[in-house]
Amino acid sequence: MLKQLGAGSAIPAEHARLPDEVDNKFTLGITTQSGARVDLTLADVDGEMIYQVSSSDELDEDERKVLSELAKGFQAAINGMTGTSPAVRLSGLTQLDGKFVQSIDFHAEVAGPDSTTQTLDFHIDQTMRKASVAGPDGSAEVNVDTSTLEHAGTKQQQSKAISSYLAQFDQAVSRGHGDKKLMTMFKDAFSDLNRTAIAESREDFLTKPSKWQLSSGDRTALTGLSDFSASISQTPKSSNPRKDWEKDTFAYDVSQSTKIEGTSHEDRKIAQSQQSQLSAKFHTEIGKSGPPFFDGTLETQNYDYHQIDDSARSDVALNYRLGKLKKASLQQVASQSEQVQTFILGKLKSDKINPSQQALVRDLLAPLTSYESIKGEDTLNENIFLLGVPGELVARGQQF
């Protein structure tokens, strides 16, 4: 397959046409800047791997080189999906060389137990990245806006922000009793797609001036990530045979949006919002964290039914006038609510709601304009990241 790509000549679409029914199927579609469309397909047919390659036009030497490098990412993505537990491995396909490639599309279908199918779809072009996962356990999606990289930070800053978000995802799946395998795929997709930074250090930004050139202080007050939206939703299950309306569910949404506007760079306004929402329902043994045993009899109808409704938000606002920072603020809120209904022999015995909320408000003007802020850039930046647990927001407020 790689030799055919390296040859560079056009390959008819009907070459090595695949049968309609295959066990596992993987496709990679590439559109070059010259307009050529290249499609690679690998499929498992009765235990034998076969392939199909097609190109709409001849490729030049640079295009062939780029496609050969992408083929390595294609193989890595395939290896991830065909492991013991399907995994998302897309980093090799996110390295889009805009000089030669317009867009990349990847699709995977992997057969699972009981005639189920796990799918992964990925798209990348000059303005966006998108990955979606679907299977018997549920679905997940990650969208990243790369139409402007003006507020994207350094690679190191993005790594810190991603690590912070991954910790939030772990807390959410634990609190909501979500599917850990599905969450792992979600985390992998989130991590791979959100690494959009090009700069190694902040000095690199000075070599690429733009209309909304951000100052060092601006970047300290922002996450460094490109704007994104991501969600994960677990397939509802009815674990209690006597009450099939009591579903076990898990849904989590998280996003970031950034606006940079104004009449000029000297009078710019920057606003960045991060938010998350967790909704989950699940059964446990009374007073415990493990699942109850149900066999359809009344004697096993002793359990707690939990309903989780959490949200978090972080807002940063920076206002400049005549080139000077006049206002800078941080507002963060974390709210958690858990309703616990206790049933004994199928009858409701107690119904309690445990709410918790904390807020943090800080004026960032002094930290961002003082000489000491140079020393504390990293510390200040780490306090910008979203927190979903009220207790953690309290701890942040005591240190910040």
Residue ranges and their predicted role:
Residues L120-F400:
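A eukaryote-biased signal for long
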Residues K3-D114, Q118:
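N-terminal, intrinsically disordered, small/polar-rich Type III/flagellar export signal
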Residues M1, M49, M81, M128, ...:
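Detector for methionine-enriched segments
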